[in-house]
Amino acid sequence: MIPKPAFEVIEPDFGHSYTYQQFDEHNPNKVGVWHYHPEIELVYVNGGSGKRQIGSHVSYYTDGDLILIGSNLPHCGFTDVLTGNKSESVVQMKQDFLGNDFFNIPEMRKIQSLFQIASGGVAFTGSTKKKIGEKIEI
């Protein structure tokens, strides 16, 4: 029997429109279970290697990972004692975190398209992974 993903409630701190969390060996990510939530999630794994399971797709990453996970797309956490990752940074935001109409303006069409593609998950590679990852890791 295939387990159903658990629903995760994401609650940004008061006065914030998104959440930011960073995990490492001293502060491990406790959400290693198969789960989903309505928020879009951007995950940067600094270093290490491991398995990523997003939706029905299972694959492996090396030398870190940068993933954009769409709304309600089931996935597992990426850092545990076996991966050797230095850290994992997670940004979670609702699709309308910048307002209901922000992504409808012409200048945001490509970002809106990226969010739609992310409904199946997007893994970034090469210099994009490194450049964006460094900016996420505060």
Question: Where are these predicted regions, by residue range?
Answer:
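Generic protein-terminus/edge-of-domain signal
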Residues: 1-66, 72
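A hydrophobic/aromatic-rich effector-binding and dimerization subdomain
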Residues: 2-17, 73-137
